[in-house]
Amino acid sequence: STVDLQFLGIDQEKDVEGLMDKITCLAAPFAPLDGMNDAGVSCGIYMTYQGGDETIPTDVDTDKPDLTSTTMLRLILDYADSVEEAGELVKQYDMHDSANTSYHYMVADASGKSAILEWTCGTDKTDNDGSARTLNVIYNDDDGRIGEREGASDFQWITNFVLQPGYYGGDDEKAGLDRYDRIYEELAATDGVLPDVNAAMDILKIVGRRDWNNDDGNGCTV
C-alpha cells in the first residue's frame, strides 16, 4: 500500500529523524490511500465533496463496530480475497470518514471484478447528515443504472463525484466530471484492456491534477 505521510502530520520534504515522527510512522500501515494485496485485490480512496455547500463527512452511528476511511482500506487489503469479500467485510462496520471530508472508494480483484462503494442519503442538496448515510455498492456487471456507457462497459472508472443515479440535480457541480470523461475515452479506445502498467500510468498522467487545466483543489483523486 502507499501512505502519504503528510496526512500523519509529518513533513514530507524532510527526513524522518525525530522520535515522535518515528513513533508516528508505526501507524503508517493503517493510513493507506490505496494498495493491492497478495490475492490481487486492490482499492483506492477518492474525495466526493458531499453535503451541498459544505462538505460533510460520513459518520454512521449504529450498533456496528466503527471504521475510518484508511482503516477500511487496511481491512480490505489484509482480509479480502475478492471484491465480494471486500464488500461483505465493509458492510459489518459503521463508516467514519477521515480528515473531515467525504469519500467514495473503488475495489477491484484479479478476476476483473470491481465495485464502487458510496455512502449517501438523498441528493447532493440534502445529503448533509453524515450519520444518515447508507452504503451503496455498484458492481461493474450491474452499473447500467449509472449511465448508458457504464452499462455497456465491462470496466469501471472513478473520480470525485457520487455515481448514484439521481444524486445530483441538473445544475449541481460534479467534481472531476471532465477527468471522468477523459478516462473513459482513453479506456474505451482499448475496450478497457491495457497492454501493461505503463499504459495505465500514461492515462493517470493525462488526468493528473497537477497538470490538468482546471481549479481542482482535491488531494485524494485520480
Which residue ranges define each predicted feature?
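A contiguous strand-loop segment
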Residues: 1-64, 100-101
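Short, basic/low-complexity N-terminal boundary segments at the transition from targeting/disordered tails
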Residues: 2-19, 79-89, 197-210
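Stable alpha-helical elements in mature extracytoplasmic
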Residues: 32, 36-43, 69-73, 82, ...
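Structured loops at beta-to-helix junctions and adjacent beta-edge loops in soluble globular domains
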Residues: 39, 46-48, 108-110, 119-120, ...
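Intrinsically disordered, low-complexity linker/loop segments enriched in Gly/Pro
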Residues: 51-102
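C-terminus-biased signal that marks the final domain/tail of proteins
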Residues: 85-89, 98-102, 110-112, 145-222
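Catalytic cofactor-binding cores of redox enzymes
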Residues: 92-125
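Aromatic-residue-lined binding/catalytic grooves and analogous aromatic/hydrophobic interfacial grooves
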Residues: 113, 122-158
